[in-house]
Curated annotation (Swiss-Prot):
H(+)-stimulated, divalent metal cation uptake system. It comes from Xylella fastidiosa (strain Temecula1 / ATCC 700964). Coiled coil: none annotated. Its main location: membrane. This is Divalent metal cation transporter MntH. It is found in: Cell inner membrane. The keyword rRNA-binding does not apply. GO terms for biological process: iron ion transmembrane transport. It is a multi-pass membrane protein. InterPro entries: NRAMP_fam. One of its GO terms (molecular function) is manganese ion transmembrane transporter activity. The chain crosses the membrane at residues 59-79, 92-112, 144-164, 167-187, 196-216, 233-253, 288-308, 325-345, 377-397, 402-422, 439-459.
Amino acid sequence: MSCCIANAIRWDVSLLIHRSMSSSMSSVQPTSPVSDSPSLGEMHASVAVSRRGHWGFRLLAFLGPGYMVSVGYMDPGNWATGLAGGSRFGYMLLSVILLSNVMAIVLQALAARLGIASDMDLAQACRARYSRGTNLALWAVCELAIIACDLAEVIGTAIALNLLLGVPIILGAVITAVDVVLVLLLMHRGFRALEAFVIALLLVIFGCFVVQIVLAAPPLQEVLGGFVPRWQVVADPQALYLAIGIVGATVMPHNLYLHSSIVQTRAYPRTPVGRRSALRWAVADSTLALMLALFINASILILAAAVFHAQHHFDVEEIEQAYQLLAPVLGVGVAATLFATALLASGINSTVTATLAGQIVMEGFLRLRLRPWLRRVLTRGLAIVPVIVVVALYGEQGTGRLLLLSQVILSMQLPFAVIPLLRCVADRKVMGALVAPRWLMVVAWLIAGVIVVLNVKLLGDYAVHLMVGVSD
């Protein structure tokens, strides 16, 4: 796989370097109407695709955007819910992870369809469809979601640095600001370099969990049985709460904006036939990538079930707690190191996608373009401050509550991304011949309904939890 990716990168590197060099001169350009120009203009159609030859080479040309999107499905919020679900209920909630992954596959396929059919990302499509006031509101809640996601990345990276190197959480949070240099270097080298970096770290995460699962040796029959839905998930209030958390933490709202934009980086023919072919390959790319995300999220829960639940550790909810228990329970010190390494790779990976998502949202809604380094500094700065304040006031234990708050904020924003997406892909004026078929829209609206109901329930439970905490 790595050989094929390297060949694909070498194939179009000259085109990428030319475009990325010109992009480095861009600054704030509020006068350039984004709705009249392509999303991420400097990277638009910058990746050459093969129109002939073996299907495998054509698929390789489209591999990348789906894996960048999949990063959002493995953030520390997913880690926390997976650890809690596995330690408390064993393998029972694997069915919820599978269901939420199917939902994500459908929604990301629709986001890719919008980008390929309309040559607009979701933010641009919203700007063309809604009033100025509505667009400002959508932009504001989306920016809040991106900051919340970045907050989870700061916490995850800081915790990983603390576990691996003993770096204090506050210092680790400050160190994460340096990642702006990494983002700039990668963006300067072109979009294929970004994708290669993300995929490489995903392979690191994958490898870490493969080793940990082998060491944990979970019973295969129980693991497979966990993917079968059970009534107990709904009947048990605690299981239902964790199930809602898993679904709410899985579909990331900014991923819909991101995916609708970065699928347009491929230089496919902008013709009806070319768009239809590009859509097939883009959906294949995102489906394969989200299956990798399914494996990693399931691995977190399986690891917690095999290591903690089996040893009667039923209340493992903090990432630090899981790290401290892994080595003694498994009897292998490297298991905990691999766990923290995977967490660090996840946090670094999210840096790239969060920067792109922020740029896409700002350009699409406001017609405002900032240099990537300035955009990154603003977002990361707003994410670091709450971490420093919470740790200073409540100690390192407060990061767990802050992580939960970030997931609640993401849940609040989700309907404001899903519903506009579904309305756009069902509009023939926007989509043309690639308008979503009726059966697909029925499925998509059912998924949207489930997500909205579950997120409302999650928010209600969180509000009750806060009120109980205040009364105590």
